[in-house]
Swiss-Prot record:
InterPro entries: Beta-glucanase/XTH, ConA-like_dom_sf, GH16, GH16_AS, XET_C, XTH. It comes from Populus tremula x Populus tremuloides (Hybrid aspen). Glycans are attached at N115. Catalyzes xyloglucan endotransglycosylation (XET). Cleaves and religates xyloglucan polymers. Does not catalyze xyloglucan endohydrolysis (XEH). Involved in early phases of secondary (S) cell wall formation in fibers of the xylem and phloem vascular tissues of wood stems. May play a role in restructuring primary cell walls, possibly creating and reinforcing the connections between the primary and S cell wall layers. Functions in the gelatinous (G) layers of the tension wood fibers that are involved in bending of the wood stems. Keywords: Apoplast, Cell wall, Cell wall biogenesis/degradation, Cytoplasm, Disulfide bond, Glycoprotein, Glycosidase, Glycosyltransferase, Hydrolase, Secreted, Signal, Transferase. It catalyses: breaks a beta-(1->4) bond in the backbone of a xyloglucan and transfers the xyloglucanyl segment on to O-4 of the non-reducing terminal glucose residue of an acceptor, which can be a xyloglucan or an oligosaccharide of xyloglucan. It is found in: Secreted, Cell wall; Secreted, Extracellular space, Apoplast; Cytoplasm. Disulfide bonds join C229-C238, C275-C288. This is Xyloglucan endotransglucosylase protein 34.
Length: 294
C-alpha cells in the first residue's frame, strides 16, 4: 500500500486553498507539555526534550506509558503534533483521545494502529456517546506519519465533532439528538494519549505480533494545544456556552470546500466505515446521512 503515502497533486491544490468550517480555526498555540498535561503511568518511559516542548513515549516488553490533561473540558479545540513509531510497529497502538469518567462515558478517539515495515499505518477513529461506541472508521494517511510531525485535532461544540489531520477534516459527527442519537454535551472530558502493546487485535486482527527485538518503540509529541471550556467533572454545562469562537455560526457545519476535502478522504483513503457496513448495520445508522459521511 505504498501508494497511500505520496502527496497528490489534488491534495496540493487543497492545501493551497484556505477555508475551514466557513472560517479558519484558531491557530494552535505551541506550549510545553507541563502547561496542560501530566504523566499518568510508567513515568520513566516518558522522555523530555527542549525544555519540555517535546516528549517521547517509550514502549518496551515491560510497559507502555501515557499522559492526560490537568483539566476537564466541555467543548473546544484540542490538538497536538505527533510523529508515530517508525519501522516495524506491528502490534503497537498510539492513541490521542478525549474521554469522560463514568460507565456511560463519552469518548472521541484517534487510534494509530502500527504495521510491519513498509506497510502503512491505519488511523482508526471512534465516537462513544452514553457508553455506546461501535462507530469505527479506518483510513490510510496520505503521508508517512513516522517521518515528520503532523497536527491531529478535534473540534467539539454543541453542533458537531470534527476530526482533522493537518486541518483536513477526516470525519464529522453531527449532533443528532433529534434522531435519537446521543451526543456528548454534558460530561466534561480529559484529553489523553498513550502508547501500548495491543498485538491481540491491532495489526491484521492480531495475526501480526509485536517484535520485541525492535523495542523500545518511540512516539514523539509537541505543540500541546488546548483551547477549551474548562469545567469540574461534576459540571453539566459550560459557563461560557455560546460565547466562545467555536460556538459561532461559521463553526456549526463544514462548508462546501471542507465537504470536498472530506469526500476526497472517503474516496481515496477510507478502508472501513461503519456507516456502509450492512453486515453490522442492516439499516444505516441515522447519524450517517446527516453527517454526509458515506
Amino acid at each position: 500500500m505504498a501508494a497511500a503515502y505520496p502527496w497528490t497533486l489534488f491534495l496540493g491544490m487543497l492545501v493551497m486553498v484556505s477555508g475551514t468550517m466557513g472560517a479558519a480555526l484558531r491557530k494552535p498555540v505551541d506550549v510545553a507539555f507541563g502547561r496542560n498535561y501530566v504523566p499518568t503511568w510508567a513515568f520513566d518511559h516518558i522522555k523530555y526534550f527542549n525544555g519540555g516542548n517535546e516528549i517521547q513515549l517509550h514502549l518496551d516488553k515491560y510497559t507502555g506509558t501515557g499522559f492526560q490533561s490537568k483539566g476537564s473540558y466541555l467543548f473546544g479545540h484540542f490538538s497536538m503534533q505527533m510523529k508515530l513509531v517508525p519501522g516495524d510497529s506491528a502490534g503497537t497502538v498510539t492513541a490521542f483521545y478525549l474521554s469522560s469518567q463514568n460507565s456511560e462515558h463519552d469518548e472521541i478517539d484517534f487510534e494509530f494502529l502500527g504495521n510491519r515495515t513498509g506497510q502503512p499505518y491505519i488511523l482508526q477513529t471512534n465516537v462513544f456517546t452514553g457508553g455506546k461506541g461501535d462507530r469505527e472508521q479506518r483510513i490510510y494517511l496520505w503521508f508517512d506519519p513516522t517521518k515528520e510531525f503532523h497536527y491531529y485535532s478535534v473540534l467539539w461544540n454543541m453542533y458537531m465533532i470534527v476530526f482533522l489531520v493537518d486541518d483536513v477534516p477526516i470525519r464529522v459527527f453531527k449532533n443528532c439528538k433529534d434522531l435519537g442519537v446521543k451526543f456528548p454535551f454534558n460530561q466534561p472530558m480529559k484529553i489523553y494519549s498513550s502508547l501500548w502493546n495491543a498485538d491481540d487485535w491491532a495489526t491484521r486482527g492480531g495475526l501480526e505480533k509485536t517484535d520485541w527485538s525492535k523495542a523500545p518503540f518511540i512516539a514523539s509529541y509537541r505543540s500541546f494545544h488546548i483551547d477549551g471550556c474548562e469545567a469540574s467533572v461534576e459540571a453539566k454545562f459550560c459557563a461560557t456556552q455560546g460565547a466562545r469562537w467555536w460556538d459561532q455560526k461559521e463553526f456549526q457545519d463544514l462548508d462546501a470546500f471542507q465537504y470536498r476535502r472530506l469526500s476526497w478522504v472517503r474516496q481515496k483513503y477510507t478502508i472501513y466505515n461503519y456507516c456502509t457496513d450492512r453486515s453490522r448495520y442492516p439499516s444505516m445508522p441515522p447519524e450517517c446521512k446527516r453527517d454526509r459521511d458515506i
